[in-house]
Amino acid sequence: MSYSITNSSLSELEYKKYARHLVLDNIGDSGQKRLKAAKILFIGAGGLAASAILYLAASGVNCLGVADDDKVDYSNLHRQILYNNKDVGKLKVGIVYDRIKMINPECNVNVYSSLVDEYNCEYIIKNYDIVIDTTDNFQSRYIISKSCYLQHKVHIYGAVRGFEGHISVFNYRSGPIYSDLYPQSLNLDVKECNMFGVLGVTTGIIGIFQAVEAMKVILGIGNILSGYLLVYNLLDASFKKFKILPKNNINVAHYHFNNQFAYCNIISEQDLSLIRSKYKIILIDVRQPEEFIKHHLLKAINIPLKNIRSRKNMYFMRDFLIDKIIIVYCYDNLRSLIASQILYKHRISHYLLNY
């Protein structure tokens, strides 16, 4: 992706504001002009967007779009640092507009006070280079992914739950797209942010990572998180990278976004009951230990996703469970699907429970 800097010039004030950028070898004058020329759209103005918007505006990005139809609620304030008590009941995008202008008065800010859906997504994103996806549901992510794919836009994905966050960059230089990680055919469903807990600072961290990836793409520096999912666990202060296996022979005209998932056999809870009655099985719960202790399926064992690639666990599953049917699961399929791809890569036969 290239950014035309022929028409971009830095004012005297901008040279003062971005002085610490300009002395960096990988940025300098031309890099700052690229940031100024970039056009970034945020879909969602919640916790992830809050930190990313602030830093990108402060970094000198001169065109930012924000799409969200939501209003500020008291329950937002612990993680959505763009807002305060006085903003409760107001449209988020109006407040975001004012905050960006306070930080970067020269920034061209476009706000869309509507829900992004299959009918308006392509229209909204067409004038931007990068789409930062801060939504909290699968339906919106699939719509964003498809629109970015068809219009050749970089899709920067982030998600949080509890003390854990995920981030990846999709559709970058013919790299994987969101459906390669979570195929639509699985009919995945996950509770939205207002239905489960999340530590506020987790959203800030992942949002900043999204901003970092956007800046790396714009500047053409570093290793972009394309083809990998980065998983950050706040409690362990750990980072894990998981490779995303892309579909083969993709082209714009014929790619189907509801591709069947070929990595493993997916079973329902009803199928599980039938298999249990006929075969020896081993249920592997890939959630964190504290989640497993609170609730788990009968006779399940716990191998957290972050540990599933260890030599010890691979040896255990490949050699000690050879006479058993391996079934992996988690609460919402997010982590079990990643675990399934890892097992597939290591040629370990298994089933994925659509729980």
Swiss-Prot record:
ATP binds at residues 47, 68, 75-79, 92, 136-137. GO terms for cellular component: chloroplast; cytosol. SMART domains: RHOD. Catalyzes the adenylation by ATP of the carboxyl group of the C-terminal glycine of sulfur carrier protein moaD. InterPro entries: Rhodanese-like_dom, Rhodanese-like_dom_sf, ThiF/MoeB/HesA, ThiF_NAD_FAD-bd, Ubiquitin-activating_enz. One of its GO terms (biological process) is Mo-molybdopterin cofactor biosynthetic process. Keywords: ATP-binding, Chloroplast, Molybdenum cofactor biosynthesis, Nucleotide-binding, Nucleotidyltransferase, Plastid, Transferase. Belongs to the HesA/MoeB/ThiF family. Residues 277-355 form the Rhodanese domain. Its EC number is 2.7.7.80. Signal peptide: none annotated. It comes from Gracilaria tenuistipitata var. liui (Red alga). Pathway: Cofactor biosynthesis; molybdopterin biosynthesis. This is Probable molybdopterin-synthase adenylyltransferase. It is found in: Plastid, Chloroplast. GO terms for molecular function: ATP binding; molybdopterin-synthase adenylyltransferase activity; sulfotransferase activity; thiosulfate-cyanide sulfurtransferase activity; ubiquitin-like modifier activating enzyme activity. SUPFAM superfamilies: Activating enzymes of the ubiquitin-like proteins (SSF69572).
